[in-house]
């Protein structure tokens, strides 16, 4: 019997096979770090008198707590400032490469690494961050870990893990012109639920996936964790190789040829058997938006807020009632009737150059609606920001009435100055819409950059087709 992509990468990194139910010992190629989940790991090394096993395979950046304006001024939040200075001190002490605020390569941890060519097919990649699954778009086995595991990888460059189950999500057919990668993943999560992928590595397959750019593939893999999965993967192909060729950390010359030859073997065998298979008809997809307080509460933009009384399952009915109350909505109201206060375009889900181009193309020649308080456009990395400015996208955003910011996690989460106030409603290209995610009492609707841009123009949740 053949093996899946995930199983191949696992086997290639197996240091020791566990026996009698014990976990395997897996070699880790790359660990990415940021200021939030690394302090305790560094302190653990310090107390034990250890040094990193392979310091050249550890790379850090500042992203979660960083301001996106006035980056040359002192951070107004004492806790955030402490975490940032602590990371800088720790990296200096232990010799870990750091891309700090203001650095040309600084950015969200899951954005700067692919741009630099650090993320490559067949690698094992970890980070103390849920959305490490983003790197699976390259055919890497990438997943988030806890702080104690961060310390373990620093000390040994290995992890003890039991093999994950495998799931195939086949996105069959061609994607309609008005549907995007974000709509694909929101539709998948709506179908299987936020726990549907628990314990699995999801491999995204099918014509619609193959037709995506690398930026779009990263969007899909990024939100694997929102489906409960440990990781998401897409087999590498010519699109992957073209993206990587010539990047700073990509192999060159004969080493490039050798790498590509290996990368081409990283695909699921025809006779491999997945533990679970899910099929999605891409031809029937369109713009999706979340209405509730978890990423699984998503619907086509043409739908209406659910009526809890029509939900048979008592648990789901109660969850819908709570979500509708928290979100300040009414059962049965059309999604397109929901007025929005703030628009956020950015994050490790949708802050890449393809995303900014998508939003700018829709905004060009328009102004934001009067009821929209602010539109924040935040590139996922400093290199994305520079590329956008080279293309004149920043001017499009500014002419529209949007704020063009520096790179960072920004309004994806309430850990930096970019927050919503209680009862403020946003449409956001980020990945989570939990209660209070964007600030205490915040109300978040997840959507694609295209829908976010159209909403900013009309003032109510809209798709480009509504313009």
Swiss-Prot record:
Cofactor(s) the record lists: [4Fe-4S] cluster
Cofactor note: Binds 1 [4Fe-4S] cluster per subunit.
Listed PROSITE patterns: ACONITASE_1 (PS00450), ACONITASE_2 (PS01244)
Pathway: Amino-acid biosynthesis; L-leucine biosynthesis; L-leucine from 3-methyl-2-oxobutanoate: step 2/4
InterPro entries for this protein: 3-IsopropMal_deHydase_lsu, Acnase/IPM_dHydase_lsu_aba_1/3, Acoase/IPM_deHydtase_lsu_aba, Aconitase_4Fe-4S_BS, Aconitase_4Fe-4S_dom, IPM_dehydratase_rel_enz, IPMI_cat
Binding partners and assembly: Heterodimer of LeuC and LeuD.
Listed name of the protein: 3-isopropylmalate dehydratase large subunit
Organism annotation: Bifidobacterium longum (strain NCC 2705)
């Amino acid at each position: 019997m053949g093996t899946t992509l995930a199983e191949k990468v696992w086997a290639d990194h197996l240091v020791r096979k566990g026996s009698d139910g014990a976990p395997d010992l897996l070699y880790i190629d790359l660990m990415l770090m940021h200021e939030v989940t690394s302090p305790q790991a560094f302190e653990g090394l310090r107390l034990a008198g250890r040094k990193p096993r392979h310091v050249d395979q550890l790379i850090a950046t500042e992203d979660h707590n960083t301001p996106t304006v006035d980056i040359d001024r002192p951070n107004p939040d004492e806790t955030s400032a402490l975490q940032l200075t602590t990371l800088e001190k720790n990296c200096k002490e232990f010799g870990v490469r750091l891309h700090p605020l203001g650095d040309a390569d600084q950015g969200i941890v899951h954005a700067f690494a692919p741009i630099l060519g650090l993320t490559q097919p067949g690698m094992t990649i970890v980070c103390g961050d849920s959305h490490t699954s983003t790197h699976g778009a390259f055919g890497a086995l990438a997943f988030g870990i806890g702080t104690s595991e961060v310390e373990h990888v620093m000390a040994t460059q290995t992890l003890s893990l039991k093999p994950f189950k495998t799931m195939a999500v086949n996105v069959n057919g061609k994607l309609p012109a008005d549907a995007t990668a974000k709509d694909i993943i929101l539709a998948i999560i709506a179908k299987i639920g936020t726990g549907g992928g628990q314990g699995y590595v999801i491999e995204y397959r099918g014509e619609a996936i193959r037709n995506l750019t690398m930026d779009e593939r990263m969007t899909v893999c990024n939100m694997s964790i929102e489906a409960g999965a440990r990781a998401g993967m897409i087999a590498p192909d010519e699109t992957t190789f073209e993206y990587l060729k010539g990047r700073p950390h990509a192999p060159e010359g004969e080493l490039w040829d050798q790498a590509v030859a290996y990368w081409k073997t990283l695909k699921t065998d025809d006779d491999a058997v997945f533990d679970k298979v899910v099929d999605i008809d891409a031809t029937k997809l369109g713009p999706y938006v979340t209405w509730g307080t978890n990423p699984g509460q998503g619907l086509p933009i043409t739908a209406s807020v659910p009526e809890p009384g029509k939900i048979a399952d008592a648990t789901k009915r109660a969850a819908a009632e709570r979500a509708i109350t928290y979100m300040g909505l009414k059962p049965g109201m059309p999604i397109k009737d929901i007025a929005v206060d703030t628009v956020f375009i950015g994050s490790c889900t949708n802050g890449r150059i393809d995303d900014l181009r998508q939003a700018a193309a829709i905004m060009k020649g328009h102004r934001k609606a009067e009821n929209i308080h602010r539109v924040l456009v935040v590139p996922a990395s400093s290199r994305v920001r520079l590329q956008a400015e080279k293309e004149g996208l920043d001017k499009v955003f500014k002419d529209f009435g949007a704020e063009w910011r520096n790179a960072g996690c920004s309004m994806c989460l309430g850990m930096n100055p970019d927050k919503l106030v209680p009862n403020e409603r946003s449409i956001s290209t980020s990945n989570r819409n939990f209660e209070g995610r964007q600030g205490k009492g915040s109300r978040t609707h997840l959507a694609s950059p295209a829908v976010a841009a159209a909403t900013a123009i009309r003032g109510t949740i809209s798709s480009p087709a509504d313009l």
